[in-house]
Amino acid sequence: MLSSATFKLQPTATGLTENHRLRLFSGSSNVQLSQEVARYLGMDLGPMIRKRFADGELYVQIQESIRGCDVYLIQPCCQPVNDHLMELLIMVDACRRASARQVTAVIPYYGYARADRKTAGRESITAKLVANLITQAGANRVLAMDLHAAQIQGYFDIPFDHVYGSPVLLDYLTSKQLHDIVVVSPDVGGVARARAFAKKLNDAPLAIIDKRRQAHNVAEVLNVIGDVKGKTAVLVDDMIDTGGTIAAGAKLLREEGARQVYACATHAVFSPPAVERLSSGLFEEVIVTNTIPIPESDRFPQLVVLSVANLLGETIWRIHEDTSISSMFR
């Protein structure tokens, strides 16, 4: 279901006029999210033609003058990631050549973020390559949400604003008034994320699932570090891809005596067989955001989808007005 519980902000982005020269455009990957962001900002999405030629090449044309404007292009690089990334690059290039004063690539989900380093010889660091492409296309700034690896910010030599979906998720969890919460990291690498999450939930205790990955998209869960018996376990991650890690973690938590298990993640990648794993009865709820569009065929009764449109809209407005973004997350 799409929950009405969203991150509540005191809207500063009201009464936009032509004099502000702020323009908002959407790629094809998540038009609904872009429309919600535009609604928060009290403006319309800019007109743009997007089409595909017979040979598969993409074409983009901005349908209004943006000369001297502060332009924001919303395009999560989700499946099909290569098409959506290429479309973003073309949009950025089109705006630069149209003499926009500043072009900001708003990337709610940054594709290729898991390829942030070499883990074996003769591999590409694709996250860095994507950063180079976006910069060379002409972007002046990037706004992204919940990067898989925070150090990706350092791959850019242009301003990079990194925002978090946790306020939206926390607002919803708080509204449920859950008791005896323990926040669980599905692996050692996510401990910092889970610890920050737990601190916002009245310093809830922390547990860690110790696992060792045998191959890509395959994880072997070994044991739980921490006490989860009789508690409401909240598994926290940045994304759910095939669901193998988080489902195996939930199964182990149940075996260790957890009373309830919730899953929270910003990005719902949901590659097969994620839906099958997540809807198998292991979770009370699977709570995600709408950074990536979720088709009806991938929805199931335990799924809760929260909107990050207000958060993104407020961030865009603050960038445009040169005001603080970090104060939103204190």
From Swiss-Prot:
Q: Where does ATP bind?
A: D55, G56, E57
Q: Which domain of life is it from?
A: Bacteria
- Pathway(s): Metabolic intermediate biosynthesis; 5-phospho-alpha-D-ribose 1-diphosphate biosynthesis; 5-phospho-alpha-D-ribose 1-diphosphate from D-ribose 5-phosphate (route I): step 1/1
Provide the GO biological process annotations.
5-phosphoribose 1-diphosphate biosynthetic process; purine nucleotide biosynthetic process; ribonucleoside monophosphate biosynthetic process
In alphabetical order, the GO MF annotations are: ATP binding; kinase activity; magnesium ion binding; ribose phosphate diphosphokinase activity
The entry's D-ribose 5-phosphate-binding residues are R213, D237, D241, T242, G243, G244, T245
Any idea of its EC number?
2.7.6.1
Chain positions recorded as Mg(2+) 2 binding sites: D187
- Broad EC category: transferase
Complexes and interactors: Homohexamer.
Q: What is the name listed in the Swiss-Prot or TrEMBL entry for this protein?
A: Ribose-phosphate pyrophosphokinase
